[in-house]
Amino acid sequence: MNRKEKTAIIQQLTESFKSHDCFYIVDSTKLSVQATNQFRRDCHQAGVTYKVAKNTLILKALDEVPHMASDVYTSLRDEVLKGFSGILFFNETASVPAKLVKEFRKQKNLDRPILKGAYIDGELFVGDENLEALSQLKSKQVLIGEIITLLQSPMANVLSALQSGKNQLSGIIKTLGDRSE
């Protein structure tokens, strides 16, 4: 690969890192060609972009990403980007790539691809042991909906108590009025 090709790959990766909220780095070595192609198809169907690149090119692309914290970059360099690295890019729900990897493993009865690391909203999750937790993450819209429901719940309880209190008060007054007659 010549310098021009490397520069083009770095630019593509940089744009992908800048334009996506999350990315997962996986190791899919020891997968057969058929399994690798199936994994790529599954990624495409789920709307996940899957790219394979050399670790040095990935690091150079990450150098160009302004929102990448230095401790995250260091962890990526020292712990995650070793050996084969495939990158899964996704924008919406951060759990989609994790669910995709989990489902692929289950369908093929394999232990690969292995999650090496995941970067989600400024946080880095290192290691395959995080796959289960990452697959259960809720989308931002779902979380916002749950928060709004929780915030509305006390208000609904107060209104209901006021309504029932009004009915009770009118019932007590009516009873006292009937009793005095």
Curated annotation (Swiss-Prot):
Biological-process GO terms, alphabetical: translation
Pfam families, per the entry: Ribosomal_L10
Molecular function GO terms recorded: large ribosomal subunit rRNA binding
Alphabetized Gene3D superfamilies for the sequence: 3.30.70.1730
Residue ranges that the Swiss-Prot or TrEMBL entry lists as coiled coil: none
Keyword tags: Ribonucleoprotein, Ribosomal protein, RNA-binding, rRNA-binding
GO cellular component, as recorded: ribonucleoprotein complex; ribosome
Subunit structure: Part of the ribosomal stalk of the 50S ribosomal subunit. The N-terminus interacts with L11 and the large rRNA to form the base of the stalk. The C-terminus forms an elongated spine to which L12 dimers bind in a sequential fashion forming a multimeric L10(L12)X complex.
Family label: Belongs to the universal ribosomal protein uL10 family.
Official protein name in the record: Large ribosomal subunit protein uL10
Organism from which the protein derives: Amoebophilus asiaticus (strain 5a2)
